[in-house]
């Protein structure tokens, strides 16, 4: 049986299918040096990396069997859904979940799912050690592959989050598979903030954009200002100002969040983002580098309006990311985040040992030590070699440093930080005595 150190290596490494390494290479692989490159790191002006590669998860293999269609359960209905026990991740609807499964119990379970509705439950553990979960998300398999490695049957899966649920009951079958009785949570769709005071005779005067309008040039900006003024003109009939209604308007909230997202990806196009407020709010939730406590809070929210308001509040206030173990050692900030994937700056990836890491890409990180030599094996970003990165203070695993294998690639280096190792914090300001007194919109 592998010791605790072996299990940690398996969790942090992307390659090394075999758990044991040759004895003569152990000293080289454990070599520890301070990461100096981050001090001079600058945001890349040009990115020639194919941003579609990370989302395709090519490291799982190209010949996966794909499925079409989707399984959706009725709102408020009660369902009994099997649980994958090794998945320790808070899955967001619409988020992709790659998996590599080795345990015979899980392999058998997935085979049975393929013959049925391909849906399993991912529990949002509020306490992983005690396996406590009140909420979760259904996941549907859309790509599947079986193979054998040294006589061990391996199942590789790509799944996507579908619907939120509340856990009603958990029970374990005789074969060891856990079944969850859940209630599917509905999405509360709120009417327009102006619907209560909008005169039906003036409905024909409203203007609606046929498609998302570019805000890049001044002309588009003027159009947007005019559109907003016309949209909230009925506020003049009430005792409340127009800006108050805009605080709860889905379109306005989405536009404010898009401005933040463009700071992470200057080439971001509106066409690449969901136009539906519900899907958009989940897309943002999946790429926010927040801890499990905040993510579960977002998962509980049943209204896209409230979810968008909370996400905007988090993006504005939680600007520093620290080591979760040290809690005060800053690793990076919101300004250093950039996107190297079509799905945004953060996505879930799985290593050959089956450990799933939600990895945030940043162009600058500090207070890190590098462990071992660079390796291209099983790299989540093809063309880049990875090196394990640890906190310089407490030596806890933070993520990886990625370096380009070719000189013409841009960026030449970046860091991938695992969400589970980061703690979002609110920096002290002169106007605030303590960050604890700052209340997020949850």
Curated annotation (Swiss-Prot):
Q: Where does (S)-thalidomide bind?
A: 378, 380, 386
Q: Which GO terms describe its cellular component?
A: Cul4A-RING E3 ubiquitin ligase complex; cytoplasm; cytosol; membrane; nucleus; perinuclear region of cytoplasm
Where found in the cell? Cytoplasm; Nucleus; Membrane
What top-level branch of life does the organism fall under? Eukaryota
Named in its record, the pathway it takes part in is: Protein modification; protein ubiquitination
Modified residues annotated as Phosphoserine in this record? 25
Name where it mostly resides. Answer: cytoplasm
Topology with regard to the membrane?
Answer: Peripheral membrane protein
How would you summarize where this protein is expressed among tissues?
A: Widely expressed. Highly expressed in brain.
Q: Where is the composition biased (Acidic residues)?
A: 24-35
Q: Per the database record, which ranges form the CULT domain?
A: 318-426
One molecular function GO term is: transmembrane transporter binding
InterPro entries recorded: CULT, Lon_prtase_N, Lon_prtase_N_sf, PUA-like_sf, Yippee/Mis18/Cereblon
| Quaternary organization | Interacts with KCNT1. Component of a DCX (DDB1-CUL4-X-box) protein ligase complex, at least composed of CRBN, CUL4A, DDB1 and RBX1. Interacts directly with DDB1. Interacts (in pomalidomide-bound form) with IKZF1 and IKZF3. Interacts with ILF2. Interacts with TRAF6 and ECSIT.
Reproduce the free-text note on domains from the UniProt record: The CULT domain binds thalidomide and related drugs, such as pomalidomide and lenalidomide. Drug binding leads to a change in substrate specificity of the human DCX (DDB1-CUL4-X-box) E3 protein ligase complex, while no such change is observed in rodents.
Protein's name in the database: Protein cereblon
Q: Which gene encodes it?
A: CRBN
């Amino acid at each position: 049986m592998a010791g605790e150190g072996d299990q940690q290596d398996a969790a942090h490494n992307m390659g090394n299918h075999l758990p044991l390494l040759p004895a003569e290479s152990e000293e080289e692989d454990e070599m520890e040096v301070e990461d100096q490159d981050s001090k001079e790191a600058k945001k890349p002006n040009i990115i020639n990396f194919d941003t579609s590669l990370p989302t395709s998860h090519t490291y799982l293999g190209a010949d996966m069997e794909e499925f079409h269609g989707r399984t959706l359960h009725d709102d408020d209905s009660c369902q009994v859904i099997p649980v994958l026990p090794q998945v320790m991740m808070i899955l967001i609807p619409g988020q992709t979940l790659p998996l590599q499964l080795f345990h015979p119990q899980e392999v058998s379970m997935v085979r049975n799912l393929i013959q049925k509705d391909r849906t399993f439950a991912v529990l949002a553990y509020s306490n992983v050690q005690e396996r406590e979960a009140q909420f979760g998300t259904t996941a549907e398999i859309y790509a599947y592959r079986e193979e054998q490695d040294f006589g061990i049957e391996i199942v590789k899966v790509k799944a996507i989050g579908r619907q939120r649920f509340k856990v009603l009951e958990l029970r374990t079958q005789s074969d060891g598979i856990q079944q969850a009785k859940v209630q599917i949570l509905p999405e509360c769709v709120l009417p327009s903030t102006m619907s209560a005071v909008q005169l039906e005779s003036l409905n024909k005067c409203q203007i609606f954009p046929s498609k998302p309008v570019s805000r890049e040039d001044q002309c588009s900006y003027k159009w947007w200002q005019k559109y907003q003024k016309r949209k909230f003109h009925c506020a003049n009939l009430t005792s409340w100002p127009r800006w108050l209604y805009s605080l709860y308007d889905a379109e306005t909230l989405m536009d404010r969040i898009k401005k933040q997202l463009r700071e992470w990806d200057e080439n971001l196009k509106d066409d690449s983002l969901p136009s539906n407020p519900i899907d958009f709010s989940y897309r943002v939730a999946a790429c926010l580098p927040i801890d499990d406590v905040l993510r579960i809070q977002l998962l509980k929210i049943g209204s896209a309006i409230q979810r968008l308001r909370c996400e905007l509040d988090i993006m504005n206030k939680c600007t520093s990311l620290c080591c979760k173990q040290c809690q005060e050692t800053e690793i990076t900030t919101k300004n250093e985040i950039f996107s190297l994937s079509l799905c945004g700056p953060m996505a879930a990836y799985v290593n050959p040992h089956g450990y799933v890491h939600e990895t945030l890409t940043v162009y600058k990180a500090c207070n890190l030590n590098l462990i071992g030599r660079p390796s291209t094996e099983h790299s989540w970003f093809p063309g880049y070699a990875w090196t394990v990165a640890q906190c310089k203070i407490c030596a806890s695993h933070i993520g990886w440093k990625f370096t380009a294998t070719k000189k013409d690639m841009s960026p030449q280096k970046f860091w991938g930080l695992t969400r589970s190792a980061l703690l979002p914090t609110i920096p002290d300001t002169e106007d605030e005595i303590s960050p604890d007194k700052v209340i997020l919109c949850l």
